[in-house]
Amino acid sequence: MRAASLEACGCFPTGRHYPGIAHLLRAVTRGLVEELAADAAWVELPIALIDVETTGTDAAVDRVVEIGIAIARGGEIVERRNWLVNPGRPIPKEASDVHKITDDDVKDAPPFDAVAEEIAGLLSGCVPAAYNAAFDRAFLGAEIARTSAASSAPAPAFRRSVDWVDPLVWARELQQGERSRALGEVAARLGISLENAHRASDDADAALRVMLALGRDVRVPRTYAALVQEQRRLAMAQADERRLNKWR
């Protein structure tokens, strides 16, 4: 079993790939940002951790009211940005109760279309990431599809072919003995503070720090290709387990 596992992965248990196969990695690993080296240490790559706050939970009908992005390069957070966004509709009380953003807060804010190009520029060339990535990816994709930015050269975060790194998947794997996977509690267990939970830039910063901290665990692959491949496997296994538990 060990030999079969190594052969499928193309790497040693440390995540370092066999010599001479770097040119083959992209052919067998889906989900990579094509501009970035598959055999690079993922922690050294530019990573954009994205967090959105919204009017609800359905990306098809609800809208973004705040977006925060934290950028890491070489394993260090080098930039944080935040935008309040006017959703063009009232923010329901149940949504405001979570993120504390009200209609008054966004009445003079620009619509998403007005900041889309700026956001796309910041995300250019970066590995996209988010905590519970399916949520943020769905909302960001829905918003960008409504704008003229959708027709320009897409940043990796806007490409359907690119996998987002998801610290939640890794928290579920590496903190299996813990009941809560809420960002604040996962962060606290790693000694990372989150003072303003559910505000986009604070959540983005904390989630990126969580991913970098989890990445120091020896069970996390070192290279970008191996990380994406293993995250896919873990996400599928975790989804299967949740479905099984639902029917027990």
PLM segments and residue spans:
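Amphipathic alpha-helical interface segments
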Residues: D166
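Acidic, Mg2+-coordinating catalytic module of metal-dependent nucleases/exonucleases
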Residues: V127-I144, E173-W247
